[in-house]
């Protein structure tokens, strides 16, 4: 079981104490010392005010923030959790991801999703109804660019040309983890990704997130079995990461967090086939964040390995 922790910037407004270079450096180094494999940042370039008022969050740009993180520690990996593929032109995304992977020496995992906030698509001038087609097209472009094949375009005068952003990434390929609970998501993972990120999704939130309910181990077990079936049908025998957000025991940093309950739930998820746990923190200052990360490392990560 590997662990990741979110940089504490997924708030609205993004707190000043969490968003400086010094804060990102301190949190990343604390995470590495506590035994976390990676740090992550979410992606909301233009969140609608109505969603924010209802409890949504802003964030730093993931590619910029994670570049600061890789400079803070020589070993920790970084994850976009997750980048909505429809928000960016795929050639721009391929360039950003390859640049971060090159700067980090091959430490990026590209977590991606289809997206569910229609108003954010509207703000960016992108068709929400075409998000699935744009997602699949983006995967095609990323694959072609990173393999060195490039993408053929038609210029304004009618001539064709090949576009191949340079430099290429260090990893061949950059691992892609796809987030979401739908069967279509698991099919994409089985055919063309290196990992799957299912999300806890109680029935009360399913309409907002436009994703199937995942509320407990029975749902998770059923979804994992479905993924394995699809992987077998795709003829793959390479390992696929399954990275969850284990909710049991509460949120680290909150007054009611129960490390023992959380740890037992992680063990149960591992028995189902989960290979990683992404942790989001409930913290209110840099000092609080560093303390919670250290205690999680001792009470959860360290306790499981002892």
Predicted regions and their residues:
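Active-site-adjacent structural elements that line small-molecule/cofactor binding pockets in enzymes
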Residues: 1-306
């Amino acid at each position: 079981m590997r662990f990741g922790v979110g940089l504490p910037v997924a708030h609205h407004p993004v707190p000043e104490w969490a968003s400086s270079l010094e804060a990102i450096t301190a949190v990343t180094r604390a995470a590495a010392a506590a035994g976390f494999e990676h740090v992550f940042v979410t992606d909301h370039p233009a969140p609608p005010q109505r969603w924010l008022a209802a409890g949504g969050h802003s964030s730093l740009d993931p590619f910029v923030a994670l570049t600061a993180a890789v400079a803070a520690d020589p070993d920790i990996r970084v994850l976009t959790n997750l980048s909505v593929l429809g928000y960016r032109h795929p050639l721009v995304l391929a360039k950003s991801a390859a640049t971060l992977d090159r700067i980090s020496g091959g430490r990026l995992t590209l977590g991606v999703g289809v997206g569910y906030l229609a108003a954010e698509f509207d703000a960016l001038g992108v068709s929400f109804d075409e998000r699935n087609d744009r997602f699949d097209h983006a995967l095609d472009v990323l694959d072609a660019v990173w393999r060195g094949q490039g993408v053929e375009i038609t210029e304004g005068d009618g001539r064709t040309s090949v576009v191949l952003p340079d430099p290429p990434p260090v990893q061949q390929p950059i691992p892609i983890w796809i987030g979401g609970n739908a069967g279509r998501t698991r099919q994409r993972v089985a055919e063309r990704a290196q990992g799957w990120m299912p999300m806890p999704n109680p029935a009360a939130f399913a309409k907002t997130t436009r994703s199937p309910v995942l509320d407990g181990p029975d749902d998770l077990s059923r979804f994992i079995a479905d993924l394995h079936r699809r992987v077998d049908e795709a003829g793959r025998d390479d390992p696929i990461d399954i990275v969850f957000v284990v909710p049991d025991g509460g949120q680290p940093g909150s007054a009611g967090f129960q490390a023992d309950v959380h740890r037992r739930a992680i063990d149960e998820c591992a028995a189902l086939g989960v290979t990683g746990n992404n942790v989001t923190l409930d913290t209110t200052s840099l000092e609080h964040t560093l303390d919670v990360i250290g205690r999680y490392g001792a009470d959860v990560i360290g306790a499981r390995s002892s």
